[in-house]
Amino acid sequence: MRPLFTIHAGEYLVGEHIERTYPQWNVWVPSKDTGIDLLVTNASNQKAVSLQVKFSKDFNPMQGSIGWWNHDSAKIQKSKADFWVFVLPSFSDKKTNFIILPPGELLRRFKAIHGMGGKRIQSYLRVTKKKRCWESRGLGKADLDLIDIDQFSDRDRDFTQYLNAWKQIEKKLK
């Protein structure tokens, strides 16, 4: 039997987090695929924020958590979502992290970090035990070691301001 409707794990985790943390908000699931995975409205349903959700399992249980994504740059550029939400559950601390940012800023950073030689962008977002967030694809072992000891510095690769950054959604729904 084929299900009529399903949501993926990342959408579920985002929706569950919102309903637990912001019980006054409403979470909606669109009935057709338009590039918007979840719609979040304020209590009166007068203001809305659209989310594109990307999920990855944790690939590094020892050093915080690391997720891997493969993006199409054209989809990011054409995205109608207000925010992209990267969902990264951690093996080590049993907590789910959310990296939340507008698609325009995401694409700007990817261009600065990886260039735009092709239309596919592979991304490794890493959350350290000290709650810093980095785009680490393409870095050598020395830089990865610096990330692990909280000594690395690169403005474009530093995604910490977007780590669990629900306040930007709160502002839009006020």
Model feature map: region roles:
Residues 1-34, 39-174:
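Mixed-charge (Asp/Glu-Lys/Arg
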